[in-house]
Amino acid sequence: MTSPTLPADRVLLSPDARRAAVIDLIRGARTRLALSLFRCNDKGIFRELAAAVARGVDVEVLVTSRAKGGKKKLRKLWQRLEETGATVYAYNDPVVKYHAKYAVADEGPALVASLNLTKKCFAKTCDAVVLTWDPEVVHGLRQLTATDRDGIAPPANLTPRLILGPETARRQFTDLIRTARSSILMIDPKFSDPDLMALLDQRRADGVRVHVHQDCRVGTMKAHGKIMLVDGARAVVGSLALTALSIDFRREVAIQITEPSAIADIQSLFTSIGVTAAEPGSVPAAAGGAPC
């Protein structure tokens, strides 16, 4: 018997599509839902979580224990989540700050995002949501939820599609940049890691086309999500910024994508802001404006 063909990975870039993807994943959960978030103030998300619990779904939410605004703001978030009936766990590593943004429903699909579940990110930011049915990604995120919830080391056998900060992020991003053959395009207003900046300089000298968009705006949207496109064939979307703090001292999750239709959508995003017009070897410090 042949295995059923899984749906192709999708990348959602428009504000309405991003929010709909999150809502649909929660609504589609039948028995269990794992959600990892940093911020959430969207009433619709809270309603959907409560509805999932009401229909018998086991909902677990993993959240940060440290954020700007202090404990009062976090307690309000925890209270709102607990009111839905979800079981809430706080990530309590004494050094590593929690910033991962993903969700898994049942045995799939899984969602990896660059955005927070906030009214602002659902309306005013340049962000991306990746939806995947890849069983290795689904299983890996399930494992990661369990280990982070229990305060133990993450699994060592995660699919290489997942980029995990701080454990593997530096090595994986270094490999992506080192192995690029023709182009490296990035949207990352916070990009500042010295080692990766030096590596991009080296690749630029090798003749690789490099463009880093560091403007505070991406078209009409506020720059927030971190998106990388390598050789027009591999993309990375997730919570990571290419800063030393984000790479080395935060729980972050990003996902690598090669699905052609998803790559085409990401390429269209870069084209819409003129990034592909960069000449080989160029790396504008801030395409379209001053650095954030």
Task: Please name every model-derived segment.
Residues G289-C292:
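Terminal interaction modules at protein C-ends
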Residues M1-G28, S36-T179, I187-F270, G274-V275, ...:
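HKD-type phospholipase D/PLD-like phosphodiesterase module
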